[in-house]
Amino acid sequence: MTTRSGTRERKDEPNVPLPTLLTQAKDIAIERLHQRLADEGFEGIRYVHGSVFRFIDAEGSRLTMLAERSGLTKQAIGELVGELEDHGYVERAADAGDRRAKIIRLTDQGKRAQVAAARILTDIEQRWSRHLGGDQVALLRRALEEVIALESG
């Protein structure tokens, strides 16, 4: 079976590499997140837009800062900001400290989408907790945090 994101479910195959399982779990969670966002009226949000939503400061951020934080190029972030701007999630405003620079800020719609996404991700985690048990989810969280710390250097 293939998910909408194109990820093939392989739960019946033995010895699937752990990184593959992690990718599949992430893909399923992200697919559910985006479907629920769309169901709630937040259209046009894609996975890659998280590079803006996750790294933007409450008071707004410069494009260069978003690029630095996300690890994307300034051009790539600029395109993502343009897409989000077209959907009404962000706006560009003059930077009070430098009139030549622009600050990217979440609009009210963008703030609502960010709050909705956080709530939906919490719902997904709670679903996992109900199915696996709170102790198992806490153990999974700790193990993943340790792997991330190990691999981040």
Language-model features: locations:
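N-terminal helix-turn-helix DNA-binding core of bacterial DNA-binding proteins
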Residues: 31-76, 153
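Short, hydrophobic-biased segments on the C-terminal half of alpha helices
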Residues: 64, 81-82
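Alpha-helical structural segments
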Residues: 24, 28, 57-58, 123, ...
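Charged, amphipathic alpha-helical coiled-coil/dimerization segments
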Residues: 3-6, 35, 82-145
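Hydrophobic residues on short alpha-helical segments
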Residues: 19, 53-54, 114
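N-terminal leader segment of winged-helix/HTH proteins
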Residues: 1-44
